[in-house]
Amino acid sequence: GERTIATGYTRDETPVRTSEGPDIATYAVNEFPLEVSQRSFWQSHKEAPRVLTEAVFNFAEVKSGDHLLDLYGGVGLFTSQFLEHIGESGRIDLVEGSKSATGDAHRNFAEHTNVGIHTGDVEKILPRFSKADVIILDPPREGAGKNVVQSMVLLKPRAIVYVACDPAALARATFNAKL
C-alpha cells in the first residue's frame, strides 16, 4: 500500500516533526467541511473547534451585511461559522501568515465571493483595511502585539473578539488597546 508522510513546520518553516497520514484531512464544524493539510494548524482536541466557534459567536454579535476581519484566521474556522450570518451583502477578510493554511482556506472558500484570503504578516496587512464592523483574532501564543492591537482600534469596530491561549498575552493586548 501507499503511505503519506509529512513534516510539520514552525512559522519560520523549520521542520519539527514527521507524521503519517493523509496529506489533507477534512473536519466538519457545525456541518461546514474544512480541509486542513498537514502543514496547517488545527486544534488537537476534537471538541475545541466547536466550543471556540460557539464562544466567539456569542460575543461577536455579527449582523447581516457586516464586514468581518478574521485575523490569524488559519484555514478559516471562524470564517466558516460566520458566512451565513453576514449574508450576501457582508464580507469576511481572512488574514494569515501561513501559506499552507491560506492555501487550505482558498480551497475551503473557493465558491464564496464575499470571502477574501490574504497571506502575510497581520501587522503589515491590517493597515490596508479602512473599516471593519467586527474583528476576530486568534493569534499564536505570543499574542497579537502592540501594533496589531492599535491598528485594530483605529478601525473602530463594533466588537473585537480576541481568542487567547496565554492570559499574559491577552493582558498585554488589552493594555495596548487602551493607549
What is the role of each PLM region?
Residues 150-154, 158-179:
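C-terminal substrate-binding/active-site "lid" region of AdoMet-derived donor-dependent transferases
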